[in-house]
Amino acid sequence: MRTVVPFDPRDPKSRLAEFFADAEERRGFAYAMLADVLGAVRDAGGDPVVVATAPVSRPVDAPVTVDDRALSTAVAAAIADGPLPTAVVMADLALATPDAIRRVFAASGDVVLAPGSGGGTNVVLARTADVPVSYHGVSFRDHVTAAERAGLTVTTVDSFRLAADVDDASDLVDVFVHNTRRTREWLIAGGWRLAVDDGTPTVVREPND
Amino acid sequence: MRTVVPFDPRDPKSRLAEFFADAEERRGFAYAMLADVLGAVRDAGGDPVVVATAPVSRPVDAPVTVDDRALSTAVAAAIADGPLPTAVVMADLALATPDAIRRVFAASGDVVLAPGSGGGTNVVLARTADVPVSYHGVSFRDHVTAAERAGLTVTTVDSFRLAADVDDASDLVDVFVHNTRRTREWLIAGGWRLAVDDGTPTVVREPND
């Protein structure tokens, strides 16, 4: 299944700015997550296509098209332009596995949604071109409401691995615990490790030897 | 299936202290979530049993036993004491649905685990009495490792609804978006509502009229 993966190669994961040494390192992290998402999509039988807000500066193992419009606009255009069904999977789902993505591909409904934590929407599968797309605000609720208003059937996939987008430092704990691809290794190579601080897991960085 | 729900009636959800007016209101919130979890367990075909750290001060729709030991100790004892299989479901899983809990009950394996966000473990299903239990630190990783060392088969249920424990104010957004039982109504009755602040969903409180 055609699977669009929106990606911001310029200033990705800005809420993690303090966690990384500089923007270039932060971009490296974003590219590692992107590679994992593309691999999981492909292993699930999907054909990933990256829709980037700017030309990519590193190798990406999928066709890349550039669309510098807002996320919702670019995604709606990608759905309208392409063959159906089309899935849309966020580029920061570092916990995504082929099994989790297969559950999306296999779900019925005009629209299949996987919620993201914090009211968001991390995966949209569109089986018709007129699926309303809006990632602003409480997007999961809005996607459900808009799709039902349009007379479309909606199915939800209840997946932690698809809900856990990596937005802030606390999310990195789950990357360490649950990622089995490149992102975890990338963090380890950079000197990060999982620690427990007063009973609470956290990710800390130690100088490389 | 016998389902143990550990509950702290004295100082629950202490990380939400600043969100509520006082400890009594915070307890009210915890009891609302507990009621939702018990309802979801029962609707999934489970028989809930509350294991509380102290006597409960409000009506609870399930048998209550008091065990004031540490969480891991009390849960291990509850598994060892009771008929098998026994499931253990955290009391703050306000997003839990019967469907999500049924997936746990239906999963095979000596041990079935549902991860909690941040490295935790939110559901344990034990089919043997010697399932190692430790909620400290990176408990999901530790549960998997300890069970495999003990020669037990481990199955994981990938569920956002079971991963999303309610620990801090940002988690309340998901209660508003995804809870369909008592907790959301409890928040609304208390004057809280979902708002969008600069594109980011948040939960705010407004004075009651």
From Swiss-Prot, chains A, B:
It comes from the Archaea. Its EC number is 2.7.7.68. Keywords: GTP-binding, Nucleotide-binding, Nucleotidyltransferase, Transferase. Pfam families: CofC. The keyword ATP-binding does not apply. It catalyses: (2S)-2-phospholactate + GTP + H(+) = (2S)-lactyl-2-diphospho-5'-guanosine + diphosphate. One of its GO terms (biological process) is F420-0 metabolic process. InterPro entries: CofC, Nucleotide-diphossugar_trans. GO terms for molecular function: GTP binding; phospholactate guanylyltransferase activity. Pathway: Cofactor biosynthesis; coenzyme F420 biosynthesis. Coiled coil: none annotated. Belongs to the CofC family. Guanylyltransferase that catalyzes the activation of (2S)-2-phospholactate (2-PL) as (2S)-lactyl-2-diphospho-5'-guanosine, via the condensation of 2-PL with GTP. It is involved in the biosynthesis of coenzyme F420, a hydride carrier cofactor. Homodimer. This is 2-phospho-L-lactate guanylyltransferase. It comes from Halobacterium salinarum (strain ATCC 700922 / JCM 11081 / NRC-1) (Halobacterium halobium). The gene is cofC.
